[in-house]
From Swiss-Prot:
Catalytic reactions of this protein: tRNA(His) + L-histidine + ATP = L-histidyl-tRNA(His) + AMP + diphosphate + H(+)
Species assigned in the record: Dehalococcoides mccartyi (strain ATCC BAA-2266 / KCTC 15142 / 195) (Dehalococcoides ethenogenes (strain 195))
UniProt KW keywords: Aminoacyl-tRNA synthetase, ATP-binding, Cytoplasm, Ligase, Nucleotide-binding, Protein biosynthesis
Protein name stated in the entry: Histidine--tRNA ligase
Entry's Gene Ontology BP terms: histidyl-tRNA aminoacylation
């Protein structure tokens, strides 16, 4: 028997209320902050991610699903959402729009990663990107928007981790300091970090291996290497977060796993026991648009995994509102009533009344049991005698009361009751 591929999952009917709830609140918060939805293809030119994410990153070197199509083009299933949005921004001339251009997405993401709780090889992200503004007040707004999104979902006990990793002017000196420091402790590093020492130095700070975390504790701090402009930007960001009452913790070891980040980086973590350590994060990527062939353009974004959000909602006992479902069951008895019930079902649905119905001849008792199991509040019963009299029985399934209603008044009566 076939099963879903490793690292993927089916989203079954019982989980759909969570997904609908999260997507609904994502669209709501996006509208509040002036973001417009943009959907990009599920696969892109592989070079887009090699160039933007970085050849030395784990994503490019280990995790991308890349294939060659029949035309010989090398394509990659989307491993992250920012680069495709930036590609679309350039391709469709959005740089002529009023800045900042605010775009959001709800997309499937694909990474060949080790499956674990809240982490899948196919997962889904809500992300938003603000392109064309460098002021730190926009950084604060993006962080606030992410924070308020979780609040809308009922996730309130959160921690905001904040750092600045500088720009292309000051970061090289910081990376040199990291290389010198880690070079003195190379023998204590895991094999991955020994590779990162030359290829992706900042990621040394992010390793979760205990031996590497011990080395990272005394590593140079990015804050000590910021140029005057980056330091002023970082201080301005902290001031803006303070005036909107967003508490933050400065984490000078915080980096992000993609090469395009600059200046602001941040992560949001739930504080509850057993929760995923990070449910969302983002940062500024002022060089990415230029790197993809555009003019120098500042930008900042955020992304959060929907599977991780739902995992945390369940752990906190947060139940989403149920999805709408029919509250009326249509039962019938007899061949003539069978055809009449098909026509009646069509009329009820045209009138906006959702119904369940039976499709094969069963006893009325069996049909009403089915109505109960489906949770219907009302049953419309149509038999041969009712049909001759031009009426139907409307039964209250919760209170066991019923009334005979003329068919030409049935729709109005049901609408009154539901």
């Amino acid at each position: 028997m076939y099963q879903s591929p490793r690292g993927t999952e089916d989203i079954l009917p019982e989980d759909q209320p969570y997904w609908h709830f999260v997507r609904q609140q994502a669209a709501r918060i996006a509208a509040l902050y002036g973001y417009q939805r943009t959907d990009t293809p599920v696969f892109e030119d592989a070079g887009l991610f090699v160039r933007s994410v970085g050849e030395g990153t784990d994503i490019v070197s280990k995790e991308m699903y890349t294939f060659e199509d029949r035309g010989g083009d090398k394509l990659t299933l989307r491993p992250e959402g920012t680069a495709p949005i930036c590609r679309a921004y350039l391709e469709h001339g959005m740089q002529t729009r009023t800045k900042p251009v605010k775009l959001y997405y709800l997309s499937s993401i694909f990474r060949y990663d080790r499956p674990q709780a809240g982490r899948y090889r196919q997962h889904h992200q809500f992300g938003f990107e603000a392109i064309g503004e460098a002021d730190a007040s926009l950084d604060a707004e993006v962080i606030e928007m992410a924070w308020r999104f979780y609040n809308l979902l009922g996730i309130n006990d959160l921690s905001l981790e904040l750092n600045s990793i500088g720009c292309r002017e000051c970061r090289p000196a910081y990376i040199s300091a990291l290389k010198a420091y880690y070079g003195q402790h190379e023998g204590k590093l895991c094999s991955d970090c020994k590779t990162r020492l030359d290829k992706n130095t900042l990621r040394l700070l992010d390793c979760k291996r205990e031996e590497c975390q011990c080395v990272a504790e005394n590593a140079p701090r990015s804050a000590d290497y910021l140029c005057p402009d980056c330091l002023a930007h970082y201080n301005r960001l902290k001031e803006c977060l303070t005036v909107v009452d967003l508490p933050f913790h400065e984490n000078f070891r915080l980096v992000r796993g993609l090469d395009y980040y600059s200046r602001t980086v941040f992560e949001i973590q739930p504080r509850i026991e057993g929760a995923q350590s990070t449910i969302g994060g983002g940062g500024r990527y002022d060089g990415l648009i230029e790197q993809l062939g555009g003019e120098p353009t500042p930008a900042i974004g955020f992304a959060t995994g929907i599977e991780r959000i739902i995992l945390n909602l369940k752990r906190q006992g947060i139940t989403p509102p149920p999805l709408p479902s029919p509250s009326v069951f249509l039962a019938y008895m007899g061949e003539a009533a069978s055809l009449a019930s098909i026509a009646l079902a069509s009329d009820l649905r045209k009138a906006g009344i959702g119904i369940y119905q039976t499709y094969a001849q069963k006893s009325i008792k069996a049909q009403l049991r089915q109505a109960n199991s489906l949770g219907a509040d009302w049953a419309v019963i149509l038999g041969e005698e009712e049909l001759k009299q031009g009426c139907a029985v409307l039964r209250n399934m919760k209170e066991a009361g019923q009334a005979t209603i003329p068919l030409d008044q049935l729709i109005c009566e049901i609408k009154k009751q539901i």
